[in-house]
A protein has these predicted regions:
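Beta1-alpha1 glycine-rich phosphate/pyrophosphate-binding loop at the start
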Residues: 1-73, 158-159, 168-207, 255
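FAD-binding core/adjacent interface of flavoenzyme oxidoreductases
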Residues: 1-4, 73-157, 255
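A Rossmann-like FAD-binding core segment of flavoenzymes
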Residues: 72-81, 175-281
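FAD-site-proximal beta/loop scaffold in flavoenzymes
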Residues: 118-149, 240-242, 248-318
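Internal hydrophobic alpha-helix adjacent to the cofactor/substrate pocket in enzyme cavities
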Residues: 176-179, 314-341
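Glycine-rich, N-terminal phosphate-binding loop of Rossmann-like dinucleotide-binding domains
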Residues: 10, 93, 104-105, 245, ...
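Active-site-proximal substrate-binding core of FAD-dependent oxidoreductases
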Residues: 146-151, 307-309, 328-360
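C-terminal auxiliary extensions adjacent to catalytic cores
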Residues: 352-400
Length: 400
């Protein structure tokens, strides 16, 4: 009798898992169901472009039916409850499983900063990107009617909290988009203040070479971006934010990209978790329940060298492959596979014409040449997930 495998989450890790498992096992061996209430996969690494209107919604949403193997059944329903003891998943219906794979991703982490959750715009999901888009456009429309200079400046100050990959990529888009919005709305671009606030000694801490990071900072400065490091946010209100130094920065727009934690969905699961709520897994991607696996951002794994699995697409995909292999072994026999991360590096956008690359085979550099390389990486992913058709769609939506 075929074993039942239920996957919750249709992001990078969830889709990679079902694609890999369906290649390893036939429908006689396994019945695979993927639960994703939206019915689409969001190309989340590109949502900063959508937030600032460089690409359309269609460019970052991939219908799951287009990329899932025919042997995988898509359930476009919200999972409301999981009964680990009886191995059941509940939507409006109930489903039995032999193996459960949790791939629900992560949520923003506000680190208990007073007022942050209530007053900042988080930047993590597609819905967040849409809210940011609506908010910034509304600011530029409303400011035309404001005469008070202090109020105008507060409205035209845009702060990104967090100088990691996500925050810098968003600022890269904001600095170009606010140019356009200023012209459209008759606003003096020089009156627009852009700021990155980072608690650590420098932005982009995962980029090895400080001189390369400094080049990116210099590029952003050409657009008037003020990069503040060693600047921890201690309080946020509707009218601004306070730094640990005591400085108050008046603003109506704080966009928070300062960290993530385990998805709140997992709170119901009686599984071992780390201090950020992520599900602890071993090298086989197994949780404290032998029939439950966790992959991607929701998984917390520390290897024998005390290295933490980072929240990157590459690590999500590799964790999915390991889980698929080990569930296959549980069903058919064989040797388990331990996770041995092979990360090739990172490339991030700093606007449309500039990027920062940290690639093992090529080194670390900044400049225009990082952009075509980033497109190549994205197209490689599109081909891997959905074949040549998705590559052509990517070229149409984002290159030509």
């Amino acid at each position: 009798m075929a074993k039942s495998v239920i996957v919750i989450g249709g992001g990078f890790a969830g889709v990679e898992f079902v694609q890999r498992l369906s290649k390893k096992l036939s429908s006689k061996d396994v019945e695979i169901k993927l639960f994703e209430k939206e019915g689409d996969q969001t190309f989340r690494t590109e949502i900063h472009k959508f937030a600032c209107e460089r690409i359309t919604l269609d460019a970052i949403k991939i219908p799951l039916k287009r990329i899932l193997p025919s042997t995988v059944k898509l359930e476009s329903a919200e999972v409301k409850k999981i009964d680990l003891q009886n191995k059941k998943v509940f939507t409006d219906k109930s489903y039995d499983y032999d193996f459960l794979v949790v791939a629900v991703g992560s949520d923003p982490n506000f680190f208990g900063i007073p007022g942050m959750k209530e007053n900042a715009l988080s930047f993590w999901t597609l819905e967040d990107a849409q809210r940011i888009n609506d908010h910034v456009k509304q600011i530029f429309e409303n400011v035309k009617n404001i005469k008070d200079l202090n109020e105008r400046q507060k409205m035209l100050t845009f702060v990104v909290g967090g100088g990691g990959f996500t925050g810098v990529e968003l600022m890269g888009e904001l600095m170009e988009w606010t140019d356009k919005l200023s012209k459209i709305n008759g606003v003096d671009r020089k009156s627009v203040k852009l700021m990155i606030v980072e608690a650590l000694p420098r932005i982009l801490p995962n980029i090895e070479k400080t001189e390369v990071v400094n080049k990116a900072i210099e590029y952003m400065k050409k657009y008037g971006v003020d990069v503040r490091t060693n600047s921890m946010i201690t309080n946020v209100s509707a009218d601004g934010l306070t730094l640990k130094s005591g400085e108050f920065i008046p603003t109506k727009t704080l966009i928070w990209s300062g960290g993530v934690q385990g998805c709140a969905f997992t709170n119901q699961l009686d599984l071992k978790k780390d201090k950020r709520g992520r599900i602890i897994v071993n090298e086989y991607m197994e949780t404290s329940d032998p029939n439950v696996y966790a992959i991607g951002d929701v998984a917390s794994y520390i290897d024998k060298f005390n290295k933490i699995m980072p929240g990157l697409v590459e690590s999500a995909m590799q964790s999915a492959d390991v889980a698929a292999n080990n569930i296959t072994v549980s069903i058919k026999g064989g040797e388990k596979q331990a996770l041995d991360l092979k990360l090739h590096g990172n490339i991030i956008y700093v606007g449309k014409r500039y990027g920062v690359a940290n690639i093992k085979s090529l080194g670390t550099f900044a400049g225009y040449r990082a952009i075509p390389m980033k497109h190549l990486v994205n197209m490689q992913h599109m081909f891997h997930v959905g074949g040549f058709g998705l590559v052509m769609k990517y070229l149409k939506d984002q290159v030509f």
